Amino acid sequence: MSEARRDSTSSLQRKKPPWLKLDIPSAVPLTAEEPSFLQPLRRQAFLRSVSMPAETAHISSPHHELRRPVLQRQTSITQTIRRGTADWFGVSKDSDSTQKWQRKSIRHCSQRYGKLKPQVLRELDLPSQDNVSLTSTETPPPLYVGPCQLGMQKIIDPLARGRAFRVADDTAEGLSAPHTPVTPGAASLCSFSSSRSGFHRLPRRRKRESVAKMSFRAAAALMKGRSVRDGTFRRAQRRSFTPASFLEEDTTDFPDELDTSFFAREGILHEELSTYPDEVFESPSEAALKDWEKAPEQADLTGGALDRSELERSHLMLPLERGWRKQKEGAAAPQPKVRLRQEVVSTAGPRRGQRIAVPVRKLFAREKRPYGLGMVGRLTNRTYRKRIDSFVKRQIEDMDDHRPFFTYWLTFVHSLVTILAVCIYGIAPVGFSQHETVDSVLRNRGVYENVKYVQQENFWIGPSSEALIHLGAKFSPCMRQDPQVHSFIRSAREREKHSACCVRNDRSGCVQTSEEECSSTLAVWVKWPIHPSAPELAGHKRQFGSVCHQDPRVCDEPSSEDPHEWPEDITKWPICTKNSAGNHTNHPHMDCVITGRPCCIGTKGRCEITSREYCDFMRGYFHEEATLCSQVHCMDDVCGLLPFLNPEVPDQFYRLWLSLFLHAGILHCLVSICFQMTVLRDLEKLAGWHRIAIIYLLSGVTGNLASAIFLPYRAEVGPAGSQFGILACLFVELFQSWQILARPWRAFFKLLAVVLFLFTFGLLPWIDNFAHISGFISGLFLSFAFLPYISFGKFDLYRKRCQIIIFQVVFLGLLAGLVVLFYVYPVRCEWCEFLTCIPFTDKFCEKYELDAQLH
């Protein structure tokens, strides 16, 4: 075996080029003097200091790292599902996604709900408030390495300050604390070993560009005649610094030119820090380079105590998200620096572009959304409270923003549907009252009459209520068999059962009417069995009839033959599609010219036998093929969409969520888009599209269901319930971040004022307050169940699990109760209309009675 290995080694040596030289150092065993707390380093670059450059050195990995990892048993499907469910709800014990969510929540809170507590400002690095963290004040234990390898004992970072610098109330309201010093283009071991380091809190990777931004850039490139691919590469080649997305992952992010600004003189240090913006495009001066070269030579001085104010003031020119923080006038004179002695190890050769990477990345870092301090928080001037636990702070910093895919998709659908609805159905009269149209129209009696058409005006600049119902608005008679509408249709059919054909004496026409409407002097009312033309059924004359242009004796399709004879009740007769005798039957009701056919008018299922001119004027649905109103189903015509499974029983329950994508007009759609691009988009960046989509849709469905119960005869469109459900998320977010806000009650009353204003605005027509109330309540339950939040200990984590179960059960109970009230035990509320529309005038609110004269 050894001979074969020796042969292979010799063959490899023969193939080695003569210019290649291999120098493999031998492994040096670790001495017994090493401390027990020595931690293995996976990156050799961590051994570099920010202070003084030295030669490159390497540390051999411990022997236990060379061992093969212990095999672990694969997790079962049950454990995987359980762990995934816990991660999704945010109650996992060791979930990185949960920590990211919690850190993001705190960032959102700092933007949306006002100022944080000063303790939070000291332990949190929130770019939205321009504050500086003082949390990297704990000095970690020094790193001991083998003396035979590196020739040194320890590396101590002087920037790692201890707890002695902490003061409980040094940060007053309105003032921001200075940043933890982060040397541009350099890092130390302490910066990475301490969990509270300022460098540790830098964002991992910037998000990709949005689709809209890339589309606009591609369109601009095409307009200029350039290729999209060339434009992208050309922009990437013009970078003067390392992209931020590769700062921490592809490299170890350490400078090629090690910074010695901590040991420089005060004048040079101030000049260096004040010229950071110029270094992006200009080279440093020769004097500064000479001073930097002289600094490592003075390495035999002993260290002294560092003054906290002087240390923090020297770093006030670091870029803080957007802009620069300048030194205040009248500051105390700097104390003289004392040289420190520190042995450092350099690990790599010079690398261009790294010196300015950290400050530029800090300057152009994308703004995150702190938990509880989003867009609404910026408008209401919220901040965190003074003190907050470091565990909560770490949860905030790990949060990453989500892409608002659901918001963009919803906005596109709303815009497209609104444009199509306005283009197809037109725009109704604009206003707050009722619009009346009067004209002279030929009716079924053969004479012209002045008729009036009443229509509710739409101040949203959009289609009429009839058109919105046809598009899929929330309308109870289309979703269930409404008792009042069904009773109204049955009474109309009962009257039609006793009607007959009224034939005018001058043979100008005939129409199906009641005896009261047929003139006894100018026409003949052909009523069976009184009239001699009555047919027989089962050996006796029929008791109901006649029907204009329909008789069982002359109809071939469908024919009235035993055992399929037409029933006695004319309201159950089918539509005759083919007659055998034509217009010469010697029956007066068959040989006349019919002047009226069924027309469905209004939105309550009212049918009237009239002329086509009158039907068109009243915006009805004229049925040329039928002769009786009982042969048509007006509710099917009014509702549109998919036909009912049973024509007598409406079943379009899908209107509960279909109406969420409709709007009453252009202004209504613009209001929804503004809400979605501000509040909804802000929340989706925090919680993700799946959670926000669940809350949005379920809140809207619950709100529409409650509105269908209490306002059954009113057509409603728009995501009113969904929007109030999203507003409820803001309240839940405020409650969850109550412990870290400086003035939570002020934020609560501001949110409450916004909700009360929107509720008052819902007293206008076409705005449903029942959907607002139900959507808000359901949004509260869903937000407590689906939105993870910041945990303040193990007890809080267990409470969250109980909270998820309880609020899910409560929401399901609320939804089940509303379903029972809608389908099983329908209720009628007379005064509920005043809760959603106050009639300031007689024509301000739309009428909902089932009177035949109202439409």
UniProtKB/Swiss-Prot annotation:
Cellular localization per UniProt: Endoplasmic reticulum membrane; Golgi apparatus membrane
Family recorded in the similarity comment: Belongs to the peptidase S54 family.
Cytoplasmic side: 1-411, 677-691, 736-746, 794-803
GO cellular component: endoplasmic reticulum membrane; Golgi membrane
Domain of life of the native organism: Eukaryota
Its job: Regulates ADAM17 protease, a sheddase of the epidermal growth factor (EGF) receptor ligands and TNF, thereby plays a role in sleep, cell survival, proliferation, migration and inflammation. Does not exhibit any protease activity on its own.
Expression by tissue: Highly expressed in cerebellum, cerebrum, heart, skeletal muscle, placenta, pancreatic islet and testis. Detected at lower levels in colon, kidney, small intestine and lung.
Residue ranges that the UniProt entry lists as topological domain Lumenal: 433-655, 713-714, 768-772, 825-855
Biological process terms in GO annotation: cell migration; cell population proliferation; negative regulation of protein secretion; protein transport; regulation of epidermal growth factor receptor signaling pathway; regulation of proteasomal protein catabolic process; regulation of protein secretion
Entry keyword Membrane: yes
UniProt keyword annotation of Lyase present: no
Keywords of the record: Endoplasmic reticulum, Glycoprotein, Golgi apparatus, Growth factor binding, Membrane, Phosphoprotein, Protein transport, Transmembrane, Transmembrane helix, Transport
Residues the record marks as carrying a glycan: N583
Pfam family, one: iRhom1-2_N
Residues bearing PTM Phosphoserine: S76, S176, S390
Residue positions where Phosphothreonine is found in the record: T180, T183
Transmembrane segments: 412-432, 656-676, 692-712, 715-735, 747-767, 773-793, 804-824
Record's protein name: Inactive rhomboid protein 1
Subunit structure: Homodimer, or homooligomer. Interacts with TGFA and HBEGF. Interacts with EGF; may retain EGF in the endoplasmic reticulum and regulates its degradation through the endoplasmic reticulum-associated degradation (ERAD). Interacts (via cytoplasmic N-terminus) with FRMD8/iTAP; this interaction leads to mutual protein stabilization. Interacts with ADAM17/TACE.
Topological type in the membrane: Multi-pass membrane protein
GO molecular function: growth factor binding
UniProt modification remark: N-glycosylated.
